[in-house]
UniProtKB/Swiss-Prot annotation:
Positions marked as site (Interaction with tRNA): H156, Q369
Task of the protein: Catalyzes the 2-thiolation of uridine at the wobble position (U34) of tRNA, leading to the formation of s(2)U34.
Localization per record: Cytoplasm
GO molecular function annotations of the record: ATP binding; tRNA binding; tRNA-uridine 2-sulfurtransferase activity
Binding site for ATP: A33, M34, S35, G36, G37, V38, D39, S40, M59, G155
Entry annotated with the keyword tRNA-binding: yes
GO CC terms in record: cytoplasm
Pfam family, one: tRNA_Me_trans_C
Active site as annotated: C131 (nucleophile), C230 (cysteine persulfide intermediate)
Keywords attached to this entry: ATP-binding, Cytoplasm, Disulfide bond, Nucleotide-binding, RNA-binding, Transferase, tRNA processing, tRNA-binding
Enzyme Commission designation: 2.8.1.13
Entry-linked PANTHER family: MITOCHONDRIAL TRNA-SPECIFIC 2-THIOURIDYLASE 1, TRNA 5-METHYLAMINOMETHYL-2-THIOURIDYLATE -METHYLTRANSFERASE
Protein name as catalogued: tRNA-specific 2-thiouridylase MnmA
Length: 390
């Protein structure tokens, strides 16, 4: 694929795969984040083929409390010893230097502590978004600058471009593989980060990535995608929260939407909006969590239709395709990574908040999750959901 091409349905932009174009000086040294998975393995190989000087790095972010047998499991997350060995194997095959760098302190402060705090506030966080914001495209980027690297690169499924109308404004676009697109968890990348980041596999289908890995003979070619949050190795959030913040796990009442007590919950952080399973209730019809009342330490449940809301308020905004929002704007929004995009109008509220009104009510709008706004294939920006509104 050429360094730049036209891309997108509603915004004229030039897509950069290598960033060796658009009047930019050719830059050669890249700090490549290698998780030990197939995507970052192929990303590193593509950069080597394109002539970059690639330095492979695995970020050690979390190994506390993870049993040795889990760390040695090749199907465990990116912090496992098996993942490090897989990344080292790929780097050796490519003939590039490889290091393991310790980011545990930064990760604990900005991801683990945030994860726990949000749950104790009755919210449902997305730790991958926090990790991208504060670790991969902040602390890791700073490390790259210290090593005199021009770029960082990852195996994320997304693309980077420049707006043809506003030279110098970097854009974040959807990947070629819609099922693997990761723009939702990348929406808070700054212009500085986008200008110094490469996503080498963003223009490929996942099947193409696996085929390339097999062609290169990588041990990661058939490795399954990581599903769990890296620091919750067994995917049991409840266990993790009980161990890390036992004082926040306080039983309380389950109320219906009329305010009647119909059961007892085991601790507010163990529940999320839209949840049906694990409520321990016997009711004539299925009920779902429709709200978490922190002040009363109560879980509010109702029927499925009561989980729908017509809008939301979001704050902590990061705009990418535009410098800011000063007037109402039509766009599409996504309230969860796997949720479909929904038509909406966004209205500014001061400098760092918006009100979002959906054309059709959306199910399980969840405080703490991100809402990301799209203009065709490109990310306008996004923020954190504060509350749902009718």
């Amino acid at each position: 694929m050429p360094a730049g091409r036209r891309y997108g349905r509603t915004r004229r932009a030039t897509l950069y795969v290598t960033k060796e174009g658009g009047g930019r000086p050719v830059a050669k040294r890249v700090l490549m984040a290698m998780s030990g998975g197939v995507d970052s393995s192929v990303a590193a190989a593509l950069l080597v083929e394109q002539g970059y000087e690639v330095i492979g790095v695995t970020m050690n972010t979390w190994t506390d409390d993870i049993p040795e047998e889990i760390q040695m499991n090749q199907h465990s997350g990116c912090c496992s010893l098996a993942a490090v060995e897989d990344a080292r194997s790929v780097a050796h095959k490519l003939g590039i230097p490889y290091y393991v760098m310790n980011f545990q302190g930064q990760f604990a402060r900005t991801v683990i502590d945030y994860f726990i705090e949000e749950y104790t506030r009755g919210r449902t966080p997305n730790p991958c978004i926090a990790c991208n914001r504060y670790v991969k495209f902040s602390a890791f980027l700073e490390k790259a600058k210290q090593l005199e690297c021009d770029y960082v690169a990852t195996g994320h499924y997304a693309v980077i471009g420049q707006d043809d109308r506003f030279p110098g404004r970097w854009l974040l676009g959807k990947s070629a593989d819609a099922r693997k697109d990761q723009t939702y968890v990348l929406h808070n990348l700054t212009q500085e980060a986008l200008a110094h980041t490469l996503f080498p596999v963003g223009h490929l289908q996942k099947s193409e990535v696996r085929a390339l890995a097999a062609k290169y003979g990588f041990v990661t070619a058939d490795k399954p995608d990581s599903q769990e949050i890296c620091f919750v190795y067994d995917n049991d959030y409840g266990r993790f929260l009980k161990e890390r913040a036992p004082e926040a796990i306080v039983p309380g009442p389950i109320l219906n939407t009329r305010g009647e007590v119909i059961g007892q919950h085991q601790g507010l952080p163990l529940y999320t909006i839209g949840q049906r399973k694990g409520l321990g209730l016997t009711t004539p019809r299925p009920v779902y969590v429709v709200d978490l009342d922190v002040e009363r330490n109560a879980v509010i449940v109702g029927e499925d239709e009561e989980t729908y809301r017509g809008g939301l308020v979001a704050s902590d905004l990061n705009w990418i395709a535009i410098p800011g929002l000063t007037f109402p704007r039509r766009c599409r929004a996504k309230i969860r990574r796997m949720a479909p995009e929904a038509e909406c109008t966004i209205y500014p509220i001061g400098e760092d908040a918006v009100r979002v009104e959906f054309d059709r009510p959306q199910r399980a709008i969840t405080p703490g999750q991100a809402v990301v706004f799209y203009d065709g294939d490109w990310v306008l920006g996004g923020g954190t959901i504060e509350r749902a509104i009718n």
